[in-house]
Amino acid sequence: TLLLTLWKSEDDRISKTESGELGSALSMFLDKMAKDRDIVPCFNSFYEFMRDDYRAEMANRPIPIYKQDFDIDNFLTTLRQYYHGGRYDFLLNSKENIDLLNKRFVVFEVDSVKDNKELFPIVTIIIMEAFINKMRRLKGIRKMMIVEEAWKALSTANMAEYLKYMCAPVKVA
């Protein structure tokens, strides 16, 4: 969801091929990270993997992937702003490993990005992923999420669907 939100605008349709290719790329990247502990788990590393390794892997397939099915150049160009030197390179490339899982009280202040059409959906997904991680991993501990500006998150179709998707595991936990 995060990669698709970074890449596509709210109006863009996401094809099964695009979703499948990103899923395959992510699996391959995680396998590579498991084998090579020197890879820093951040967006820069994933971007370089897509640019160098995955693009080469796509070129060597017996069944070609056409640009109209999955345009890796468009993906890389669009996501360049989150890569080293881009205007949002700070967002997904933290040098610190912050443990939100074991913090008893976490506040995300989103006032500065709530009107930013590019950043707000990304920040919302990161917050929701942090919360769902707590829900799944911290068994037997009472959890609460208060969303003060929920109306803002629900104002776009993609975010409304994502919040709906995230509610199912919360009800179970």
Segments from the language model and where they lie:
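Flexible, glycine/threonine-enriched loop-and-boundary segments that flank and lead into catalytic domains
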Residues: 68-110, 114-130, 161-162
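P-loop NTPase catalytic phosphate-binding loop
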Residues: 1-34, 102-133, 137
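Helical/strand "switch-coupling" subdomains that flank nucleotide/phosphate-binding cores, especially
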Residues: 1-89
